[in-house]
Every structure is written in structure tokens, then in C-alpha cells.
Curated annotation (Swiss-Prot):
SMART domains to which the protein is assigned, alphabetical: Enolase_C (SM01192), Enolase_N (SM01193)
Highest taxon above the source species: Bacteria
A Pfam family this chain is assigned to: Enolase_C
Protein name: Enolase 1
Cofactor note: Binds a second Mg(2+) ion via substrate during catalysis.
Record's keyword annotation contains Lyase: yes
Residues that coordinate or bind Mg(2+): D244, E289, D316
Residues reported to bind (2R)-2-phosphoglycerate: Q164, K341, R370, S371, K392
Source organism: Desulfitobacterium hafniense (strain Y51)
GO BP: glycolytic process
Gene Ontology MF annotations: magnesium ion binding; phosphopyruvate hydratase activity
Length: 437
């Protein structure tokens, strides 16, 4: 019996953490095995991402996904029937071929990725093994260092503060569970500081605290340091700070300037680099994402020349999980790390290939969720399957975030003594030497 062959493919509309529709796909094999994938969605999206297909009609403010679902059920499903689910690369190649566009704009990356995710889960379930083991084999045992949002700003909090994410990374913990406990303590300490200052504690899209009453972006850095200390840790020794600037959101491509609306400042690229460099000198910052715009290659190069040996510089909107854009970054020596988002490229195979390309060229992969998330935990398994070493899924609150952190805790327990946790050693591959504080 060829139980490993695909018997049916079914897509449906479900909802993400921002109450927007998204695509869920079930793939059933001939032996009855089922795999399921739910597609995430971003708020601040790069210009060069694979195209997420939305209906553009009155329902759901134009964000319906009935067209993408129709494409799965009517166009993709018939051509996936009887395929061997064990051959993920062949399935993804067929999905790409059926769409026929370089950015998956005809059928929608959300339609294609849903099928790709469901197929890999069906394959893992067919063999009755965890997804990280199915995709990564016996060598998949490196647990990711968590990058956890404490304050959510930018597009995740109605732009009440310009910087999108203020995060912490545990650097002294010997295990994932101990590292995650540290960031939870910092998160709760930050809430206490907000309450003590009489500020309402609201929650941003990814579970971080809503930055109420800030007069400057730098206040977020000061609050993180205070929170780390209140939790009983030493900033720069036990935990470092990470920032997602998401600078494309406030970049003016015509003038080549950056507008910090909170402070009513307009900065040249040189001034923007100078501001970030000053922050790195004055605070225990060990990672900056999208410090300069996706359209500002010159600015990104200036930032890398200034900070590339001191801290991790992550390209998200700049690279969009796309090997050709990462190749350009490698050739120009821009950044030293790549944010990995499945829906930016659109299939599991392409995502894994991008991670491998990143690692092979001395850059650090950081597997990431989106602001519109669900209970789906594929990215956790993907991070461990590829030994990526870092995971960014939002904060320590909201169940679509904790679902993923909890999945890492379960995998850590399952791996037992074979689990490897790199702690701050994860940054060594990029030749980063952190400042001492």
C-alpha cells in the first residue's frame, strides 16, 4: 500500500492573532495520516517579499483570503494528488511551477506556503517523528537562543514610538529553559515599572508592552536596563538588548532621510548611523535589525562598517529571506545576520535553502514569526531542524507566542542530554565581539 501518497488537499479560512483571515491547509495521505499548516502574516512587510494574496473586497476590510483558498482547492490540490509526501522538494517545486511567477503573485504565497507546511507535517506524521527530526535528521539538536520582545512599537503599536521592537536576549543562561525564565522575569519587571509610573499596561501585536507616554525612543532602552536590573540581573552580562528599528517604515527614499516622528527629528543616513552607534556605546545592545531602510544599501553599508564587528546586524526587509538579495549583501559586506520568515519566500524548501546559504556564507540565521500569528509551531521545528541558533517569535505574552516558546521547552525535554544550547556563543560564527559593560 502506498500510504505515503497524497489523497486530498483541503484549504479553509481561519483567523490570526490580529483577527485577520488567514489560510489553513490540511493534507491527508492514503493511509489516513494528516498534516496541517497555518500561514502567518506580517504588519510591516518588505517590498521584496513573496506576494500574500488578499481579496481586496468589502469583507474583512479587504483582507479576506477566499481567492487564495480557491487556488488551493481548485488549482493546487488536483496537481498534488498522488505525490509522494516524503519528497518535500518535489512538492515545493511543483507548487512553484504551477504558480509560474518569481514572487508567487498569481496564486499567492499564502496559498503555496499553506500547502508546503501541511505537506512537511504530513511527512513527519507519516513517519511518526517530530517535525524537527523529519526535516533535520539526527543532527538536529541545537536549541535556539530566544530573542524576546519586551516593548512593542512601530507598526505593532500604532506608531506611538518609532522603534518597532525593544527586545532582550539571555547571554549567561546555560540552557534554553533557564534563558527563557530570565526573559519572563524581565518582562514582568517591565510591567511593574509601567504600573509604578502610573502608566496603563496595554499589549502590542506581538505581546510586548504598549509604549505609553514615551517622550523619546531612547526611553525604551533605559526602561529595558531598569527592567533587567529590577529582575535581579546585570545588563550586558546576563542579558543583552536587541532592537528591530524597522527603519523602512519611516524612511523617505526621495530625500534619503529618516523621520523620527516621536522626537520630531529628520536624520540623514550618516546621522542615523551615528545615533545607533551612540546607543550601542551607551547601552548593552547586541543586535540591531533593519537599522537602515531596505532601499538604502549605502546606509546599510555605513552601519555595517561602523558596527558589524561589535554587534549582530540583521537584515529583514533588506533580504526578505531571498537568496539573491542575501547574495548581494554578502558581496557588499552588508549586515552579518538574516531574519528568516517562511512567508517572505513561500515554501519550506526555499526557506531551508536560504538558511543553509546564510550559514555557508558566515551570516547568522534568525528564524522569526510574524506579527499576525497563530498556534502553528512550524518555525520552532524549522529553527531546530536547521540548527539555526536563534528564534524570534514576539513576547512572553499572548498564546500564539507562548505556544512556540512552550514547544521549545517540550523539545528541550525530549532531547534531554543530547540538547545543545549555544547561549552567547551563537554569535561567534559572525566574528562578533561584544562590548563589555
Amino acid at each position: 500500500m502506498e500510504g505515503f501518497k497524497i489523497k486530498s488537499v483541503k484549504a479553509r479560512q481561519v483567523f490570526d492573532s490580529r483577527a485577520n483571515p488567514t489560510v489553513e491547509v490540511d493534507i491527508t495521505l492514503k493511509d489516513g495520516t494528516v498534516g496541517r499548516g497555518i500561514v502567518p502574516s506580517g504588519a510591516s512587510t518588505g517590498l521584496f517579499e513573496a506576494v500574500e494574496l488578499r481579496d481586496g473586497e468589502e469583507t474583512f476590510d479587504g483582507k479576506g483570503v477566499s481567492k487564495a483558498i480557491h487556488h488551493v482547492n481548485e488549482q493546487l490540490a488536483p496537481l498534488l494528488l498522488d505525490m509522494d509526501v516524503r519528497d518535500q522538494k518535489a512538492i515545493d517545486s511543483r507548487l512553484i511551477e504551477i504558480d509560474g511567477t518569481p514572487n508567487k503573485s498569481r496564486l499567492g504565497a499564502n496559498a503555496i506556503l499553506g500547502c508546503s507546511m501541511a505537506a512537511c507535517w504530513a511527512g513527519a506524521n507519516y513517519y511518526k517523528v517530530p517535525l524537527y527530526r523529519y526535516l533535520g535528521g539526527s543532527a538536529a539538536n541545537k536549541l535556539p537562543v530566544p530573542m524576546v520582545q519586551i516593548i512593542g512599537g512601530g507598526a505593532h503599536a500604532d506608531n506611538v514610538i518609532d522603534i518597532q521592537d525593544f527586545l532582550v536576549i539571555p547571554t549567561s543562561a546555560p540552557t534554553f529553559s533557564e534563558g527563557y525564565e530570565m526573559v519572563v522575569n524581565v518582562y514582568n519587571a517591565a510591567k511593574m515599572i509601567f504600573k509604578g509610573a502610573g502608566k496603563p499596561v496595554s499589549i502590542a501585536d506581538e505581546g510586548g508592552l504598549w509604549p505609553t507616554g514615551f517622550q523619546s525612543n531612547e526611553e525604551g532602552l533605559k526602561l529595558l536596563c531598569e527592567s533587567i536590573e529590577l529582575a535581579g540581573y546585570t545588563p550586558g552580562q546576563d542579558l543583552g538588548i536587541a532592537l528591530d528599528i524597522a527603519s523602512s517604515e519611516f524612511y523617505d527614499p526621495e530625500r534619503g532621510t529618516y523621520r523620527l516622528e516621536l522626537e520630531k527629528k529628520t536624520l540623514t543616513k550618516e546621522e542615523m548611523v551615528g545615533m545607533l552607534s551612540d546607543w550601542v556605546d551607551n547601552y548593552p545592545i547586541i543586535s540591531i535589525e533593519d537599522g537602515m531602510s531596505e532601499l538604502d544599501w549605502e546606509g546599510n553599508l555605513l552601519l555595517t562598517q561602523k558596527l558589524g564587528k561589535k554587534i549582530q546586524l540583521i537584515g529583514d526587509d533588506l533580504f526578505t529571506t531571498n537568496i539573491e538579495r542575501i547574495r548581494k549583501g554578502v558581496e557588499m559586506k552588508v549586515d552579518n545576520a538574516v531574519l528568516i520568515k517562511m512567508n517572505q519566500i513561500g515554501t519550506i524548501t526555499e526557506t531551508i535553502e536560504t538558511i543553509e546559504f546564510t550559514q555557508n556564507h558566515g551570516y547568522l540565521p534568525v528564524v522569526s514569526a510574524r506579527s499576525g500569528e497563530t498556534e502553528d509551531c512550524t518555525i520552532v521545528h524549522l529553527a531546530i531542524a536547521t540548527n539555526a541558533g536563534q528564534l524570534k517569535v514576539g513576547s512572553a505574552a499572548r498564546s500564539e507566542r507562548t505556544a512556540k516558546w512552550n514547544e521549545v521547552l517540550r523539545i528541550e525535554e525530549a532531547l534531554g542530554s543530547s540538547a545543545r544550547y549555544p547561549s552567547k556563543g551563537v554569535f561567534a560564527a559572525a566574528g562578533i565581539q561584544f562590548n563589555q559593560y
